[in-house]
């Protein structure tokens, strides 16, 4: 995360508050129920003959301030002021893991609320027929790792950052999305 970013704020109905952002260098706006912070989340997945469905995880570098050395979702972060949800998802995938994706590559999975005023718009990207050329900023991401989807629960319990260890709803929604779209 860059400390000079302005995060887009939203009304409780999900509409962006025009021209209103939260300075990310300040404390988080968790005390204001009327302002919601948006997060774009991207799960990169692929199907292989060996392991079936796999999810891509990123390991956070030792030098980051939040959750160093823990594994995290493929990519994700706050939506910048004036940025659309799709633009944020594309940007975060590029910035965090060097994945060059287009808006058409993103498939909407679900929206999840967490904390009292944070909402994550969750997308999936099929990487099945692509070459693994992930280039990432070593200061933020140490490595990326493909993990069989059937091992998700065990993997996140052992290696994921604390907030993901207890987040079963997101992964259940992802599983349902995979099932309804013929990946599982």
Language model: regions and residue ranges:
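Acidic, metal-coordinating catalytic segment for phosphate/diphosphate chemistry
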Residues: 1-50
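Residues that flank catalytic or metal-binding motifs in active/ligand-binding sites
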Residues: 5, 38-40, 75, 119-121, ...
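Conserved Nudix-box catalytic region and its N-terminal flanking loop in Nudix hydrolases
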Residues: 22-39, 51-91, 95
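Histidine- and/or cysteine-centered catalytic micro-motif in compact active-site loops
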Residues: 47, 60-62, 76, 111, ...
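A short coil-to-beta-strand element that immediately follows conserved catalytic motifs
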Residues: 100-109
């Amino acid at each position: 995360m860059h400390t000079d970013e302005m995060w887009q704020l939203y009304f409780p109905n999900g509409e962006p508050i025009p021209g209103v952002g939260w300075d990310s260098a300040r404390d988080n706006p968790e005390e204001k129920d009327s302002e919601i912070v948006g997060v774009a989340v991207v799960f990169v997945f692929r199907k292989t003959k060996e392991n079936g469905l796999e999810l891509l995880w990123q390991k956070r570098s030792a030098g980051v301030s939040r959750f160093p050395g823990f594994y995290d979702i493929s990519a994700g972060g706050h939506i910048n002021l004036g940025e659309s949800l799709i633009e944020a998802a594309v940007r975060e995938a590029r910035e965090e893991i060097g994945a060059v994706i287009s808006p058409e590559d993103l498939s909407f999975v679900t929206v999840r609320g967490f904390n009292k005023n944070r909402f994550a718009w969750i997308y999936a990207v099929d990487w099945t027929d692509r070459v693994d050329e992930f280039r990432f900023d070593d200061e933020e991401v140490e490595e990326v790792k493909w993990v069989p989807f059937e091992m998700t629960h065990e993997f996140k319990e052992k290696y994921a950052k604390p907030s993901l260890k207890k987040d079963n709803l997101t992964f259940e929604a992802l599983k349902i999305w995979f099932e309804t779209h013929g990946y599982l």
